[in-house]
Amino acid sequence: MVKKNIVVVGTQWGDEGKGKIVDLLTDRVAAVVRFQGGHNAGHTLVIDGKKTVLHLIPSGILREDVECFIGNGVVLAPEALEKEVAQLEDTGLKVKHRLKISDACPLILDYHVALDQARELARGNKAIGTTGRGIGPAYEDKVARRGLRAGDLKNMSQLKQKLQTAMEYHNYMLTNYYKAEPVDFETLWAKCQAYADLIVPMLADIPNLIDLYNKEGKNLMFEGAQGTLLDIDQGTYPYVTSSNTTAGGAASGSGIGPCQLDYVLGITKAYATRVGGGPFPTELRYDVATDEGDAVGKELGTRGREFGATTGRQRRCGWFDAVALRRSAQVNGLTGVCLTKLDVLDELEEIKVCTKYRKDGQDVFLPPSSADEYELVEPHYETLKGWNTSTVGIDSWDALPEEAKVYIRFLEKEMGVTVSILSTGPDRSETLVLEDPFEV
């Protein structure tokens, strides 16, 4: 078999079920590479009924013969890393010798978290809905060339000088602009010395490791976080994350050449969800706190257990948006789609799919680039018949209800991409592979 470099990305607003699919496919790879985002991601894996939630470490860590790389596109929170390593090793998994970290990873430090939270508070009802974990401010420091990187932990005297300079700037912003408490230098400096003990032994030249594995003919998996519609450039700006969540980010965020990427698998929920603020044309509004709103929105949220793995926040739920998926197919160059959570729709009498928007009396078949324009569109739906029977655990195409097959084929037509994998439940075993990405 010829080696394959597979990229796995979310095609919606995140929470599509990427972790399960990466874990499923990692029995065929030598390493899994995270290439963007930080510990704001929450990848939930269920294996033999046991649930594991990962925020930073690649999902391949649960397979003991798979190495895990954290690429330069990831912003690294040392405390989150330490906690996750400890939790995994408490279960008997050996983590540290299999985890390699790029020395170019920007570090998320206490002042990034303080800034993130102060900004969200200042935005009031215009809040973006960040996780408040310092992701955005850390990426800002990277682009402004004042960020501290994982490799800086190798030289503590230089690190101390860089930290003092960075903290002067950020504490000035915190105290004078946001009227918030400053971050204490001595406390953070002591933490950084402990961070070095944890991280420095795991530092590695990730682009070189990727190149060596490719030359040896080994398969690699590149694991995205969040989703395409949260991409800093292609998403519903400014209600986006601070990194490139699309397939192109796999190259810039890890150091692999783009021509080395062989297959782009887009993880796509059979309906739509979104966390936080921002446009969502197909939303079925329901508030779990008051138990008020749309009945189907409630059912999707309840059956789909739509609460964030990282924050616990209620996810907004809605019908499948094929307009948004067309954009995802374009900007990712999707080879195939993995459709997840089909079973959540099992008890619906009818299922709607948004096939186009209407704006100013015109049909719109691709999403607008700005959030302001996005808020003005109206969804146009096609209605399909539900199947009213369980699809949980179905492991063959022929065993699917006829109406479910019709729904899947309809989505394929509207997206312009073939469904290659079907997830019929949370467990690793509840998956139907229609087209093997490693065999294409």
Swiss-Prot record:
Q: Kind of enzyme, top EC level?
A: ligase
Positions of Mg(2+) binding: 15, 42
Catalytic site: 15, 43
Catalytic reaction annotation: IMP + L-aspartate + GTP = N(6)-(1,2-dicarboxyethyl)-AMP + GDP + phosphate + 2 H(+)
Q: Which cofactor does it need?
A: Mg(2+)
Cofactor binding notes: Binds 1 Mg(2+) ion per subunit.
Give the family per the record: Belongs to the adenylosuccinate synthetase family.
Per UniProt, subunit arrangement is: Homodimer.
- Tell me the function of this protein: Plays an important role in the de novo pathway of purine nucleotide biosynthesis. Catalyzes the first committed step in the biosynthesis of AMP from IMP.
Name listed for the protein in its UniProt record:
Adenylosuccinate synthetase
Per the UniProt record, the source organism is Hydrogenovibrio crunogenus (strain DSM 25203 / XCL-2) (Thiomicrospira crunogena)
